């Protein structure tokens, strides 16, 4: 976990939506969002995806708070929110890639949350070995998501996606520890960075869709 958290400041400084959207050596340079996609539609899509991904981190934070409070009913309700949000995120790609791809993304997001939940429970229990196992599962899942999305869209380089997803995971893990420690000042700072970073992720996805499917924008 410590290694994962240490890479976060570097990733936050180096990653951006533009870097994630495409590189000069990528097939993605064949089409750019500004070439034929309607800017207003791209902006609208960015706003929708930002809202969905913000819901992802907010619903998981709700699970974490309920877990720290040992409130089983609140945790159950929060987890239902996580699932509903994952379904919405998965459905957002269906108009572009079809139902099978949407179902696959939902499965991958479920795997992401499963590893996140395992780490949360291990953090509450103070079980270092379980935390490390959860980090391994998170890393494997991030690789699966990166492979899936980069395979679907050439404007999303796999290595860049992996970096974005691991930075995202590090935010979750840092937040859990801060909540456990009652370090609410630093947790608020983590939340600000977490929100900014998830917007980097969602904006990159929107830009990549506009680049690949300009006629839909």
Segments and roles (model prediction):
Residues 186, 190-217:
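A cross-kingdom marker for long, charged
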Residues 30-80:
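Immediate post-signal-peptide N-terminus of mature secreted/exported proteins
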Residues 8-17:
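Bacterial N-terminal signal peptides
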Residues 1-8:
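Bacterial N-terminal signal peptides that target proteins for export
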Residues 55, 104-124, 155-183:
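Long, amphipathic, charge-rich alpha-helical segments that form helical bundles/coiled-coils
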């Amino acid at each position: 976990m410590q290694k994962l958290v240490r890479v976060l400041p570097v990733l936050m400084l180096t990653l951006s939506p533009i870097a994630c959207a495409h590189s000069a050596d990528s097939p993605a340079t064949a089409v750019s969002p500004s070439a034929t996609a309607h800017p207003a539609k791209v902006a609208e899509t960015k706003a929708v995806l930002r809202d969905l991904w913000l819901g992802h981190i907010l619903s998981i934070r709700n699970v974490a708070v309920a877990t720290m409070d040992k409130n089983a009913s609140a945790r159950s309700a929060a987890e239902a929110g996580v699932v509903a949000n994952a379904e919405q995120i998965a459905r957002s790609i269906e108009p572009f890639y079809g139902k099978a791809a949407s179902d696959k993304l939902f499965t991958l997001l479920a795997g992401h949350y499963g590893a996140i939940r395992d780490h949360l429970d291990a953090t509450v229990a103070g079980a270092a070995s379980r935390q490390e196992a959860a980090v391994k599962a998170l890393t494997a899942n991030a690789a699966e998501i990166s492979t899936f999305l980069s395979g679907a869209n050439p404007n999303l380089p796999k290595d860049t996606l992996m970096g974005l997803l691991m930075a995202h995971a590090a935010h979750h893990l840092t937040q859990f520890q801060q909540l456990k420690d009652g370090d609410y000042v630093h947790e608020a700072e983590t939340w600000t960075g977490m929100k900014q970073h998830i917007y980097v992720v969602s904006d990159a996805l929107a830009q990549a869709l506009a680049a690949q499917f300009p006629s839909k924008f």
